[in-house]
């Protein structure tokens, strides 16, 4: 099992639009062979304060949204990226200025899990 994570720095003025794009997606990936699940994680702008010993809000921090997809194999994910459905899912380009910088794409293999049999 692998997890593909796309870490995306979204400009603060576009956060609602970015979230709406995922809420309104057509779920093409969900029907792809080997697809397990998809999650979108919203950044929580907090940091640990050594002065107070607790977590405090940090609105100045550039957070990253994380779009995670779980796949049975790397080959299943690669096949998705080469499919017409992938091209269709990514055809509606976001407006200029939506992103505060480049995204970071990472692929990890699940080593251990408390809820999956790996």
Question: Predicted segments — roles?
Answer:
Residues 28-36, 54-64, 68-106:
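An amphipathic, aromatic/His-enriched active-site/gating alpha helix that lines ligand/cofactor pockets
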Residues 2-8, 66:
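Active-site-flanking beta-strand signature of metal-NTP-handling nucleotidyl enzymes
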Residues 50-57, 110-118:
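Short, low-order "capping/linker" segments at domain edges
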Residues 22, 26:
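Short amphipathic alpha-helical/adjacent loop interface patches that line ligand
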Residues 41, 106-108:
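Solvent-exposed beta-strand sheet faces enriched in polar/charged residues
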Residues 10-18:
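Short, surface-exposed ligand-recognition loops at beta-strand->loop->(often short) alpha-helix junctions
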């Amino acid at each position: 099992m692998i997890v593909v994570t796309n870490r995306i720095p979204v400009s603060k003025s576009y956060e609602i639009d970015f979230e709406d794009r995922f809420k309104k997606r057509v779920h093409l990936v969900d029907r792809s062979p080997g697809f397990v699940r998809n999650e979108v994680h919203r950044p929580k702008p907090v940091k640990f304060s050594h002065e107070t010993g607790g977590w405090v809000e940090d609105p100045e921090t550039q957070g990253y949204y994380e779009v995670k997809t779980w796949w049975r194999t790397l080959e299943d994910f690669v096949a998705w990226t080469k499919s017409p459905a992938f091209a269709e899912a990514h055809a509606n380009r976001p407006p200029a200025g939506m992103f505060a910088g480049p995204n970071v794409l990472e692929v990890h293999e699940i080593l251990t899990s408390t809820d999956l049999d790996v």
